């Protein structure tokens, strides 16, 4: 399946409030993008690197108040970072890798908070489950849509992303990463590095 189809399916499921399916299809869009950008790398490495390349875009569309660059998550996923403490790219690859066995639901250990008016947040429960905002689907879609490798992808004209007063018709915004970054550069958000001190005490690296 190509990137355009994956983005379309992600947003169709988003509109139906089928959050799990939206995230899984959005992950497929990032996977397709990563394959174009880093064809010589393995699936896990290229998927994570593509997210880290565009962490500013993912962050602004997912949860502007969370510092995803510095936050680490004490959950049971593999990390390729030197200290083995998973970052958001590791967590999202954990969903993507296991999600191929689930057509519409996230794999065990991952939950989503339905999208709504409350500020997006992340929780880690005592049983080790991580609860992410459903808006991670929009963050992943944005990473794919604005990636320069995806200029020329095709999607019907009524699909769009929005950020405050800005509306981005996806059919005309494929690959316009630099321009999107210019638009969001005016944003001023206070970012918080999430503190999971208690959960780290019982965490062990994979």
PLM features per residue range, with description:
Residues 1-24, 28, 41:
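Charged alpha-helical initiation segments
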Residues 4-7, 48, 94, 98:
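Hydrophobic core segments within long, regular secondary-structure runs in both alpha-
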Residues 15-18, 34-38, 101, 105:
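Hydrophobic/aromatic-lined pockets within catalytic cores
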Residues 25-71:
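Short, contiguous, well-structured surface segments enriched in hydrophobic/aromatic residues
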Residues 53-177:
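Long, charged low-complexity segments
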Residues 156-206:
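Sequence termini and other peripheral, non-core segments
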């Amino acid at each position: 399946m190509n990137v355009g189809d994956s983005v379309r399916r992600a947003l169709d499921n988003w509109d139906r409030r089928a959050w799990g399916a939206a995230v899984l299809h959005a992950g497929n869009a990032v996977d397709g993008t990563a394959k174009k950008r880093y064809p010589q790398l393995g699936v896990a490495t290229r998927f994570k690197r593509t997210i880290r390349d565009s962490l500013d875009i993912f962050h602004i569309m997912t949860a502007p108040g969370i510092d995803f660059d510095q936050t680490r998550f004490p959950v049971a996923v593999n990390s390729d970072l030197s200290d083995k403490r998973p970052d958001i790219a590791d967590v999202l690859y954990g969903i993507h890798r296991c999600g191929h066995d689930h057509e519409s639901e996230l794999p065990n250990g991952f939950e989503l908070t339905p999208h709504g008016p409350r500020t997006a947040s992340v929780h880690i429960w005592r049983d080790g489950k991580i609860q992410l905002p459903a808006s991670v689907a929009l963050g992943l879609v944005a990473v794919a849509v604005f990636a320069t490798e995806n200029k020329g992808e095709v999607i019907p004209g009524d699909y769009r992303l929005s950020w405050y007063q800005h509306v981005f018709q996806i059919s005309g915004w494929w690959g316009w990463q630099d321009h999107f970054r210019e638009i969001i550069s005016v944003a001023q958000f206070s970012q918080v590095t999430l503190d999971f001190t208690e959960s780290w005490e019982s965490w062990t690296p994979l």
